[in-house]
């Protein structure tokens, strides 16, 4: 037979939804009377950028990758509920906003509770974002993204670019040098402190 430790478990929640609810803080206070310590197992970091989902590209690596087209484009990289799992999706579409007027893309990453701020930044995904000029043809965007992915695999793209018309070449080349989305300076440390603060809230209520 095995013994069950009734004082060991986990709590999963979204601070944005319950962080301001007095009932939730009451729950934390109750838990504080039952446990001697609490540690951060993992947390999801969400970062929104005011860019159309069509103007974002997630760089792939050797991990499992999946793309789903439903209520916008959603890309997944890695294994769910494991550190460095990434999800990039159309937040405006999820909120049922007019995506022609509101451009909002969310980058989510699952973080290990043991990570330092430096490790969090090291695992931050390579997401490229840009602002397409009005009137940009869909085929230019598609070709540009495809060639950018080929270039990341160190495959030749110049031969293909030179097969395009003279006016299309510079437009497509722009997709080969789109900037990466980076977290604001100091943001990783602030988010870690906030995440660990919820553990302190449990222990501090003892």
Q: Each predicted region: which residue ranges?
A:
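Structured, helix-rich domain cores that form ligand/interaction pockets
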Residues: 1-163, 183-205
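Short, basic interhelical loop/turn and adjoining N-cap
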Residues: 162-175
């Amino acid at each position: 037979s095995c013994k069950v430790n009734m004082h060991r478990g986990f709590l999963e929640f979204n601070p944005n939804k319950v962080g301001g609810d007095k009932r939730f803080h009451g729950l934390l206070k109750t838990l504080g009377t039952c446990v001697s310590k609490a540690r951060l197992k993992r947390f999801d970091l969400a970062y929104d950028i005011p860019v159309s989902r069509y103007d974002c590209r997630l760089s792939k690596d050797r991990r499992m990758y999946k793309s789903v087209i439903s209520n916008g484009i959603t890309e997944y990289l890695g294994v769910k509920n494991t550190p460095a799992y990434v999800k990039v999706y159309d937040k405006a579409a999820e909120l049922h906003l007019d995506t022609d007027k509101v451009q909002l893309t969310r980058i989510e990453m699952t973080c290990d509770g043991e990570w330092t701020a430096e490790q969090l930044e090291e695992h931050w995904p390579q997401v490229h974002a840009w602002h397409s000029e009005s009137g940009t043809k869909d085929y230019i965007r598609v070709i540009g993204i495809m060639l950018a992915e080929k270039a990341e695999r160190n495959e030749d793209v110049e031969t293909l670019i030179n097969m395009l018309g003279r006016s299309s070449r510079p437009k497509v080349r722009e997709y080969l040098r789109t900037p990466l989305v980076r977290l604001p300076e100091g943001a990783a440390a602030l988010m870690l402190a906030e995440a660990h603060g919820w553990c302190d809230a449990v222990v501090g209520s003892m």
